[in-house]
Amino acid sequence: DLHVGCFHRGVLPPTAPLPIASVTMTGMALSSWKRGEDRFHVACIGEGSSSSGEWWEALNLAATRGLPISYILQNNQIALDTPPVNQSNVELWADKAVAMGMPSWTIDGSDPASWHSSVACAREFSLSGGGPTLIHVETMRGCGHAHHHDDLYLGAPSGTPPGYVDRELLDYWEAKDPIPTHRKLMLSLGFTEDELTQMEAEEKDLVDSAREHVEAMEWADPTTVTLGITSLHDADTHQDH
């Protein structure tokens, strides 16, 4: 669980208190809006964190100002070890946007085409002056809250403890794994096995190349650890240091 980002590519590092990430991205959207920039923003959050006050404050500001941002709310079916029924009384998590007066809709998180079309639609809507949106994604977390939590979630191999996840629900979502199912869909649409194999080889090369690049990099100079994080350095942008 490495919390890193790449500011010049528009990716902010995740924050450990998850709702704060939505607040931060809303602030970025506000800044972009005030500057008149043609930029779209995305903030992702799980259903558990959507119960927090910070998240609601972010949505309220975005809706009031008509900011160019979309909030992606993933219903993972369980937050740490709390099921949705004990978190909210909404039937659909998309309904949370109604109170803020913003459009929302629900998609199947196992369908890559739905992801692409939904975010593209939200982007076009925001940048044409429509304001923020909320995309409710139905999916399921396949492991523990973090990997050190897997035994509590899935249960130990011995069966003791048995784990708290709903096994039938987990089996349902495992059968919807988008990697094999979307591959089958592409074959049914006319792509050939050779074309898919070539795509997969190209993707693997990209990942391997990125990994090799990172492994070859020198370790950061420890004397620079505080640069750009306090007002003493007077950094105008994140890129100065």
Protein language model features and the residues they cover:
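Generic beta-sheet signal
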Residues: 39-43, 69, 129-137
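Proline-centered helix-kink/hinge sites
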Residues: 23, 29, 68, 103, ...
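Conserved thiamine diphosphate
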Residues: 30-39, 90-121, 170-202
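Short beta-strand segments
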Residues: 5, 19, 44-45, 71-75, ...
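Short, contiguous strand/loop micro-motifs
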Residues: 45-46, 79-81, 169, 198
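Glycine/aspartate-rich loop-and-adjacent alpha/beta segment that forms the canonical ThDP
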Residues: 125-241
